[in-house]
Amino acid sequence: MDLEVLQRILDGREKPTNLSFELLKNITENFSHDREIGHGGFATVYKGVLPNGNVAVKRIRNSHSINEALFYREVDSLLNIEHKNVVRFLGFCASTDQTAIQIEGSKQHIYAEVRERLLCFEYISNGSLQKYIADELRGLEWNTRYEIIRGICEGLHHLHKEKQIYHMDLKPDNILLDNDMVPKITDFGLSRLDEKSKTMSEERYGSL
């Protein structure tokens, strides 16, 4: 049932919604290394395979350091964005579980909270703008360059002026290109979560 819901969301027949951790785990083959398509200091991105297409699953690391209110506020922002030059948001997962750990040399257990926070987006197969800037052999025609620049500007205008969302980390790595070389802005919400988690870590453990 969960798989069918995500398929309908990908097809545009349903709105983005809460997705189960088991679903995202299954479509990425238990977040296998072979499905990893990107990573940074904040999240690892996996390719999720569906019968009707592919998705990108961002698994946030150190989820315990993410402010819950901020996470849901960012999800709410993502749910309200729909623009051809912004990567399409498909859903989120906020799973919290308990695990029992036996104390060594004792029959007693301690219980730890296990958090999983994930975001699901459309899969963009043509890579980032950075790849084309760094590789001269890919040489883009002037008209293509112009359309990419215009698309980025239109996407930013939608975020900044219409949604009052500021990217804070715009760079070629965060501009993805689809098969028609249409630019798609990504990671605008994650940059704010990352800054918050860094602040929380510094407050708890001191600046390194």
Could you describe each region identified by the protein language model?
Residues 1-120, 126-127, 133-152, 203-204, ...:
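Membrane-proximal cytoplasmic juxtamembrane segment of single-pass receptors
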Residues 62, 83, 161, 195-196:
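Short, conserved catalytic or interaction motifs in soluble domains
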Residues 133, 163, 197:
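Short, flexible helix/strand-to-coil boundary loops that buttress conserved ligand/catalytic motifs
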Residues 154-165:
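Protein kinase catalytic-loop region centered on the HRD/HxD motif
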Residues 164-178:
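Catalytic-loop of the protein kinase fold
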Residues 183, 196-208:
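Regulatory activation segment
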